[in-house]
Regions:
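Sec-dependent bacterial lipoprotein signal peptides
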Residues: 1-20
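Structural signature of multi-pass, alpha-helical inner-membrane proteins
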Residues: 2, 22-166
């Protein structure tokens, strides 16, 4: 009887481990390029967690609020565009993201919005005017030749994330 009980317990443990292994990878997207916009932490963020970042090319370092200003669920499209000063990324936001960006651009004038891709800072823009249309432009500190692939990777990640929410 004791051998049967031990066998039953071992069998139950094996089933639990096999089920937990199945859930471990659920929701994980391999090779993800997750874009998020973070606001520079410049006083007044008392209880907010501040994370130090260092820009890849300039070496400029400062703190950003750990909670994203705009997350991957609020970004609807990303384009690589040519503007007067060179190549830039254009982010189109949904209504919730546009509203948050507008509020931040009004109340945090002079602060930077940092583009983080999978947790790594790649670009920043100073909030110099209110952004009312939900379209955010930023330059990066990456070489122009890397931008096209970055945009493709971010779009692919967004498509996979958004398709899982439907």
């Amino acid at each position: 009887m004791k051998i049967g009980f031990n066998f039953l317990v071992l069998g139950a443990i094996a089933v639990l481990f096999s089920l937990s292994g199945c859930r471990q990878h659920r929701g994980v997207i391999d090779d993800a390029a997750v874009p998020r916009l973070h606001l520079e932490a410049r006083g007044g963020f008392g209880s907010a967690r501040v994370v130090p970042v260092e820009m890849p090319a300039s070496g400029s370092s400062f703190g950003v609020v750990s909670e994203p200003l705009v997350n991957e669920f609020e970004i609807t499209n990303i384009e690589l565009v040519r503007v007067e000063l060179g190549m830039a990324l254009m982010f189109q936001l949904n209504e919730a993201g546009a509203r948050k960006l507008y509020r931040a651009s009004v109340s945090n004038r002079g602060s930077r919005v940092v583009l983080m891709v999978s947790g790594a800072p790649v670009g920043a823009r100073v909030l110099d005017v209110p952004i009312q249309d939900g379209i955010f432009f930023t330059f990066t500190e990456l070489p122009d030749r890397a931008l096209e692939q970055l945009v493709l990777d971010m779009r692919d990640t967004l498509e996979r994330i958004h398709s899982r929410r439907r």
